[in-house]
Every structure is written in C-alpha cells, then in structure tokens.
Amino acid sequence: MKRDLVLVIDFGGQYNQLIARRVRECNVYCEVHPYNLSVDEIKQMNPKGIIFTGGPNSVYGENSPLCDKAIFELGVPIFGICYGSQLMSHMLGGKVATAPVSEYGKTKVDVNIESKLFEGVSSSTICWMSHTDYIEKAPEGFKVIGKTPVCPVAAMECEDKNLYAVQFHPEVMHTEEGTKMLSNFVYNICGCTGDWKMDSFVEKTIEEVRQKVGNGKVLCALSGGVDSSVAAVLLSRAVGKQLTCVFVDHGLLRKNEGDEVEEIFGPNGQYDLNFIRVNAQERFYEKLAGIEEPEQKRKIIGEEFIRVFEEEAKKIGTVDYLVQGTIYPDVIESGLGKSAVIKSHHNVGGLPDYVDFKEIIEPLRLLFKDEVRKAGLELGIPEKLVFRQPFPGPGLGIRIIGEVTAEKVKIVQDADAIYREEIANAGIDKEIGQYFAALTNMRSVGVMGDERTYDYAIALRAVTTSDFMTAESADLPWEVLGKVTTRIVNEVKGVNRVMYDCTGKPPATIEFE
C-alpha cells in the first residue's frame, strides 16, 4: 500500500532537514526536494501536502529561487514558511517589502485560533522569527491569521485553496507550539493518516530486499557504527548467510571496540551472516608513521581501508550486491532526492569499482539518524550499539593531534574509556550529544609523587546539539570532571594533565582534526 507523502520544497533554508524530521515525528512520511522540482514530477509523486522552506534570499533578488506558479493550481495543500511565505505572497499578487525593523529571535505572535492551522494553539504564542523582508499586504483572497507589532502578516491563509503561510519557523524548538502547527497542517489540512511507522518500514524493507536479492550474494563493509550495523542486521534478516560482512580493524577504534563488534556479529554472535574480521593495525600504523597533517592522515586512512577491503572482497569472489549505510541526510546533501531503496551501480557516484557487483543496496536511504536508531531497536539490536556515540571514519586518527603511533592510540583509548565510563556512571550520557577524549600534541611538566614528569595533556570534549551543524559546550558537573581527571592522570600512563574544551561550534568543529 502506498504511504502518504508530504513534500518539502527546499529554497535554501538551513532548517530544511529539520522540517522533514518534524513532519516524520508526526508519523507522516516526508521527502526534501530542490525548488526546481517540476510540476509534472510533483504530480507523479502524488503528495498529500507541500511545504515551502525558508531561505536566505529576497523574492526580489535577481537570482532568487522561484517555483512554477502552476504548483498553486494542483489542488494540493501548501504551507509556506518564512521565505516560502513571502514567495507565496509575491507569486499570487501580494506585496513583500523590507521590514522597518528586522525580527530575529523569540517573538510573541497573535494568531487566529479559528484557523485549522492554529487549532489547539494559544491565541498569543511564542514563535521564532528570522527575517528582514516581510509580507506587507496579503494576496487577494487571503485572510490574515497572525500578526506582530512589526509584522502585519505574520500568518495568512486562503482556506478555499488550502494555502497557508507563516513568517516564523514552526519547525524550531524555540517556536513553542510549532509541532502542533505542523501536525495541524498534515492532519487537519492535508488529511494524512499517520502511516509512517518504523515497524512497518522494517518489515517492508526486509521483504523488498529479499525479493530483490533472491539467491544472490551480498557484501557489506561493517564499521561497527550505528548505520552500518543496522544495515547489516536488516540484510541479515532478509537473506541470512547470503550476506558477508567485512570488518576492517584499523587499530584506531575505541578501547575494546573491535572485540565488541566481533562479539555481536561474529561466529558466536546472534546474527545469521558470514563475518570476516581483518586485523590490519600494523598496516595502518606503518602508513601513518611520520604524518602529522590532518587531511593527509584522513586520506591515508581512507585509501588504506579501501585497499584492505578490496583484498578481502577479491578473496570472496563475485558478489551480486554491495550494501551501503547511506542515510537520508546524505541523499539530501547530494541533491539526488530520490527515494528508491535499491538502485543500480552506475547511477551512484563514488562507489568502489574494484568490487565486481551488479547493484547497490541502501536499506536506510529513507531514514534520518534518529530513525536509524529506532529501526535498530525494532530489529532487536542491543541499546549499547544503537546509541553508540558518533565516531568519525578515520577513528582515533583524528583524535590524536600530530603523528599517530601505537603508544598514542593506547593512551587516548584508555583516557576515552574512563571518560565514557564516568559520564555513564553519572547518568548524563543521554543528555550529551557527543563526548570523547583527544590526545593533544602538547607535553607539559608535572609532579607525580616526588618525581618530575614531562607527559601529554588530554583534552576532554562534550557538546550538546540537535543536528551537529551547530553545538554548544556541555556544562558538565565539576564533580564528574574532577573524577575523570583524577582517574586519567592516575590510571593512564603518559598523561599528567587534563583539559576541558569549552568551545562551541562555530567557531570550532566538534572533532579536533
């Protein structure tokens, strides 16, 4: 049965993925597509509703993104947000102008609660504004349903044509009743049924993969991260021993992580698949010897990983399908925007040519990260794996400033394990977006017992974030930081100083390199 679909048309807004996530949280399936999506393509998709995103442009700008005016004649409900609201007004005969005063931040908006859009919403509600232009006059046939002292048309509707628009951002958490507004749009206005559920997605995807693969052989590069692990388990459910997972242990994983992956997926694990572990630590350490520049380290680690995987793939022989853990943000950022779970090798950029296979399978291609975790739980994957901390592809190679050596890897592994253990013991691990220890390239003088030391400094990082695009330094309790510090300097040989990184993103990145 075909599911309900809401389209998010992207006009360059920074919150486009967030809008889609909020709609999906309402149990309605949603896709993000570029603003130049044709009316014919939209008709083929048969959406229940359309949302126009915000964007940095003015509708009067020379190169500002516009949509085909025919979209308003499709009879499909449309919800314009920020730039999307101005675009709707501009294209339908309203007047958009530069606001006398820019509105930015939390703003009290008076709304008409008789509108379907604001059903169950307070008549005066806090919303997040971020605009310099505004709708000065609504188009003919539209009714003003929201205003502020600065913005005379903070919200408008043409109920007969199911066209709605707001100047603020209902998708951000600062708009206190924004989720309710989006829910009203998809249910009260679009008539969606709420048929996007993870159990049905998992069941449907398993059946699709099973039908596609038949008796074919499937190969998966397993990193032990959330995406590749969920993809592997899903494929295992579909085709069992026809799946071979290759796990390349490059020696740059967190403490005991390689053994944990083997315990879960290996011969004594709970999944019906073939598992190959390649212990390639020495190869990677040799390649990284003397290399200090971060991008060079990344490149070496990536290229060596490909070589190792290639060698193992050749031993396996011909495979019919290659599994990738692509998730929906990757699809959006690539500009592809299509929703097929399985697509041919030649239609995908950047795939390895050294593996002889017919097609690629991307079972998580439709899911956001939080949905991947839900799928993992639905598949019965242990929580410790499903909620594992984000970990970069180059691993500890970019959490060690400067040259990577086996000695340095052990130092950062031990320090990081202590840090993660104490965060969990304090019961705050679910409150922090990401946390880890990094080894600086700095040595300093210290005193241990009666002896002078000259050892490394460890940097602790912890951030809170909803999207990893921006982040704030986490306000960790001093008691926890003190305990972590005491344990690291006493238990980790080669460290005599611990520092806490208080920098947000921007200006810093979350990782050190």
Swiss-Prot record:
The keyword Disulfide bond does not apply. Its EC number is 6.3.5.2. The keyword Hydrolase does not apply. GO terms for cellular component: cytosol. Catalyzes the synthesis of GMP from XMP. Homodimer. InterPro entries: Class_I_gatase-like, GATASE, GMP_synth_C, GMP_synth_GATase, GMP_synthase, GMPS_ATP_PPase_dom, Rossmann-like_a/b/a_fold. It catalyses: XMP + L-glutamine + ATP + H2O = GMP + L-glutamate + AMP + diphosphate + 2 H(+). Residues 196-388 form the GMPS ATP-PPase domain. Residues 5-195 form the Glutamine amidotransferase type-1 domain. It comes from Clostridium botulinum (strain Alaska E43 / Type E3). This is GMP synthase [glutamine-hydrolyzing]. ATP binds at residues 223-229. Pathway: Purine metabolism; GMP biosynthesis; GMP from XMP (L-Gln route): step 1/1. The active site is at residues 82, 169, 171. GO terms for molecular function: ATP binding; GMP synthase activity. PROSITE patterns: GATASE_TYPE_1 (PS51273), GMPS_ATP_PPASE (PS51553).
